[in-house]
């Protein structure tokens, strides 16, 4: 049980809050309790303010033990106000924990938090910490953050994954291009575009001209047929075979057939094949998730917006009903 780690601290905080509550009642004030949380990579700073007065602050770990302590503190008050600055993946766990336990919260992006605190004349050199976040809530009275359905978060995660894979593909293409300049640069002219399943399979089969010239015409034709999963006519095969031989005769390879550069060329071609397949899988998942959403068909009806763009827009904007 995690309660054994938090009992003493929670009891102390509860006593402090009770004292402040009694003082507030004596003055006829309504008690407001604000939890300001400054989230870092490993831990978070928590500041608890009652009617603008700090009653407690501590550091908690960003794990089950730390969150259990926070939960114990939250349970000691009625309708606590929780405010924290979004710090990317680091604040994601805190947000998930609060969602799971049904607590409303206000999540600020870093620029928004800085702008708001600047307007309150907090010195720009001051670090935006938990206490400042909590203190500003008594002045700004921010609304709680709209909690989207899980499907929108999943779409955002898939959209970011798709973007990362696209960046990986661009890097791998650049590396393949550089390696081919040493072994067989003419091969980039075999198809209309040096990209796609057939091109990468041809690169794997023929990383330098020797692999072309060592084959008979029939063997070369068969390799070309195997380079694509699509149907390819005999005329097209013959054309590519003749062109491949011409490019090989034109080429001068800067390395020997046993050079590790050929292994590098094949590696990047295989990696591009794998990355492209994975990216298509992610896109299919995005489309499957987005199709039931009403905004999906609306976005597709706009000229120039296809499936990839539509799903990415939904992933980045989220549920537009929150605006």
Task: Please report, for each region that a protein language model flagged, where it lies by residue.
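A detector of single, family-specific signature residues
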Residues: 1-323
